[in-house]
Amino acid sequence: MAWNYFRSYPRTDRAFPATLRLGLLEVTAFIGSEEAEKLLLRELDAPGPGVEVAYLEIALQDMAPGKHLKKILEITRELLEKLPPIPAGEFSVDRQAKGYLYSILVKYRDLVFVKTAERLLVNPDGSLDGYALSYLRRVLGADAIPILQRAIVDNRITDGVAKYAVRDAVLHYVGQSAQADKILMQTVQEGLDQQKEGREFNWGPFKVSNSALMRDFQNQPNETLLKRRQLIQNIREEFNHPTLNQGLN
């Protein structure tokens, strides 16, 4: 689901576990003994939904920081690769299983799963996995752009939200990446190509590019800000569209 790209990854609620089983895992972790650690490890060997792995990751890292992390990440990757579709009628924590698992990989900047996430990014029916997209952007940064460029031109993707999400992921790096800057200019050109003669100017196609130019403006380094300002000037000069230029002022 492409919308998941725009959402935060789900978080565990350790104060109020969503199920009795999660509550029992929490109590076991609270005991904190060697036997409790062994019990949690046995649970990790045969985990339930993604949320259980998320609870176990926190518990085991609290009890023995780093000791079981390799195993946690291996199991997380295995579950994500084989995760079946979750029916809509399931509990909320079960429907969010994929989000919980990806949140673990993002937390530890795990790069091992990158190739698999690239394969899972676009489903056979053309739908976009928003969690996979978010993972790729967060762990790779601007290095994700070549992967995302392939998604931009993937003819299987026809949904407007999915197309927007992929562009947004690339344009996070406007002013930092020459590839992102080039795609920004292409996006502006495509927006102008969509205008209808004699109709009111449609700003919709420019939302993603305008948002990229202004994103987190106050926290960017001076070099990035200067490059963004230059991009705005390039847009004015290259396309020379009165309405667009006025909107860029």
Language-model regions, residue ranges each:
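Repeat-mediated protein-protein interaction surfaces in helical alpha-solenoids
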Residues: A2-P10
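Structural detector for internal amphipathic alpha-helices that build alpha-solenoid repeat scaffolds
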Residues: Y9-I31, R42-D45, V53-G66, P87-D110, ...
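Sec/Tat-exported extracytoplasmic proteins
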Residues: T28, G32-E35, L44-G48, L80-P84, ...
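Flexible loop/turn segments at the boundaries of HEAT repeats in alpha-solenoid HEAT proteins
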Residues: A36, P65-I72, F113, D143-L148, ...
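Short, flexible helix-coil linker/hinge segments at the edges of structured domains or between repeats
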Residues: K70-V93
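Long, ordered, amphipathic alpha-helical scaffolds
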Residues: A151, I157-N249
